[in-house]
A protein has these predicted regions:
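Membrane transport/envelope proteins' first extracytoplasmic loop
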Residues: 1-331
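Interfacial "coupling" helices/loops that link adjacent transmembrane helices in transporter permeases
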Residues: 46, 335-355
Length: 355
């Protein structure tokens, strides 16, 4: 017992006598450990900055997800089933990075007719289509008139076939000028073939413009309010109607009528980082396959997975130099520690031999 106490006394005395060298060794060890342990954290921080920079310099609408189902019959039940399927896939795969979602429906093209004057025919025959946007009121300015109302549900066949029956719609300013119509005027859309050919009258209750034509809400579409055309082309009228009107009236007036359905999901790029990038990429590809299997002719458009692949391909070119520098510094510190330790051992060699 006394021998052990004597040994500890010698250790304490010699440590106090050589505290400068021992402190140097201890500091060197701490620095080496801290440097090596922080290298992965520093690497992740650089990776996050690189990915964030890449995402911020891309067009956000191309990063957002657009699920589209073209040329589908307009059927409320089928639409609800498709929406539930898409929502299930989104929730299962990428919900954490989604900050907003909207829907957009665009009908097939119809022949358009005036009710107060002759309508040009042949190659100059005006045309038009219906559009439905969720939360439209938050993104438009009503220049004249009032916000549209939905056609009542449960309309009878007699009511629908009434020659005076009409639905309410809104039209863009530029399109209204092309058609020379205003609030209170009517347009008639005609479509279908054979026995299913029919006409639907639209009362224009508002002339509208987008609050911001470049808003992400419009998904880079430049023909929402007016369709660009040449001077020799007939005008086309995009008419905005409510979703209730679309499903309550459209399928009965145009039994063969079809539309393209779009589900839009806006990505929060702040929630995409180097840690979850691989998971997001795989989730998008998995979701695309599942939708194509369960929703025929549908598609998923986004460049987010391509950006992640491109980012991962460039990643090693930044990681390799970083880790080479870190290991070089760590090697220098270790060399320094070994040198100082040898000096300390040489200095205390006499005491160790005596002990």
């Amino acid at each position: 017992m006394s021998l052990l106490l004597s040994a500890w006394q010698i250790v304490i005395k010699r440590s106090l006598a050589n505290w400068r060298l021992l402190s140097t060794v201890l500091v060197g060890v701490i620095v080496a450990v801290a440097l090596l342990s922080s290298a992965p954290l520093y690497s992740n921080a650089i990776n996050d900055l690189g990915l964030k920079h890449t995402l911020e310099n891309r067009v956000i609408e191309l990063i957002d997800l657009q699920v589209y189902a073209p040329n589908y019959f307009v059927n409320q039940e089928e639409y609800n089933e498709a929406t539930a399927l898409i929502e299930q896939q989104v929730s299962k795969n990428i919900r954490p990075v989604i900050r907003q979602q909207e829907t957009w429906v665009k009908s097939q093209t119809f022949y358009a007719y005036y009710t107060d004057r002759p309508t040009p025919g042949g190659q100059f025959q005006p045309k038009g289509h219906f559009q439905v946007f969720s939360n439209l009121i938050d993104h438009i300015d009503i220049i004249d008139g009032r916000y549209y109302e939905s056609a009542p549900a449960g309309l009878t066949e007699e009511q629908l076939e009434d020659p005076n029956f009409s639905i309410e719609g809104m039209i863009g300013t530029e399109t209204a000028e092309k058609f020379q119509v205003g609030v209170g005027d009517f347009l008639v859309f005609e479509g279908g073939y054979g026995d299913n050919r029919n006409r639907l009258m639209i009362e224009l209750v508002a002339i509208i413009d987008p609050k911001d034509p470049n808003d992400e809400f419009w998904f880079l579409n430049t023909d929402i309010f007016t369709v660009p055309q040449g001077s020799e082309e007939p005008p086309i009228a995009p008419i905005f109607i409510t979703q209730e009107t679309l499903f309550n009236v459209y399928p009965y007036m145009f039994k063969d009528g079809r539309a393209t359905f779009n589900w839009l999901y806006f990505v929060d790029i702040e929630k995409v980082n180097s840690t979850n990038a691989e998971t997001i990429k795989n989730a998008i590809r998995r979701m695309e396959k599942q939708l194509l299997t369960n929703l025929p002719r549908s598609g998923l458009f986004t460049i987010l997975d391509s950006i992640i692949i491109e980012y991962q391909g460039k990643l090693m070119f930044t990681q390799i130099p970083l880790f080479l520098i870190v290991f070089q510094i760590a090697a220098i510190i270790l060399y320094y520690l070994i040198t100082v330790s040898n000096m300390l051992i040489d200095r205390q060699q006499g005491e160790i031999s005596l002990f």
